[in-house]
Amino acid sequence: MIGNWNYGTGRRKTSVARVFIKKGSGKIIVNGKPVDEFFARETGRMIVRQPLELTGHLESFDIKVNVHGGGETGQAGAVRHGITRALIDYDADLKPALSQAGFVTRDAREVERKKVGFRKARRRKQFSKR
C-alpha cells in the first residue's frame, strides 16, 4: 500500500487495528466488509465514525482496516484509535481537536489477571468463621 495512503495503528484491550486512509468518497472497509456489515451494533459503527465526524471528513476518505483480536467493542475502539492516528498522519493540524476529544490517547485499561486462590481477579473465596 504505497502511494497516497496514510497509515495509523490503533489498539484497545487486546485488539489491534491497521488503518489505511486516502482521499475518496467515504467508504469504510473493515476486514473486507463494509463497516455497517462488520459491526452489528450501532454503537460500534458510531465509535468508528467519531474522529471523522469531529474533523468534518466523514465523506472525504476511503478507509481500509485490518483488525484482529479481542471482541466487538475492543475492535471498534482500536479502529477509532487507528483512524485518529491516520488522520494525524494526513494532517497534523487536526491533532489538537482530536486530542481534546480524547481520541489520541491510548486507553491503557486491560483485563486484570486471575490470582491463585481467588475465584476471579479480586473475588476471594467465601470466608467461614466456623
From Swiss-Prot:
Molecular-function annotations in GO: RNA binding; structural constituent of ribosome
Keywords: Ribonucleoprotein, Ribosomal protein
Coiled-coil regions, chain positions: none
GO process annotations (BP): translation
Annotated InterPro entries: Ribosomal_Su5_D2-typ_SF (IPR020568), Ribosomal_uS9 (IPR000754), Ribosomal_uS9_bac/plastid (IPR023035), Ribosomal_uS9_CS (IPR020574), Ribsml_uS5_D2-typ_fold_subgr (IPR014721)
A Pfam family annotated for this UniProt entry: Ribosomal_S9
GO CC terms in record: cytosolic small ribosomal subunit
Similarity-based family: Belongs to the universal ribosomal protein uS9 family.
Protein name: Small ribosomal subunit protein uS9
Gene: rpsI
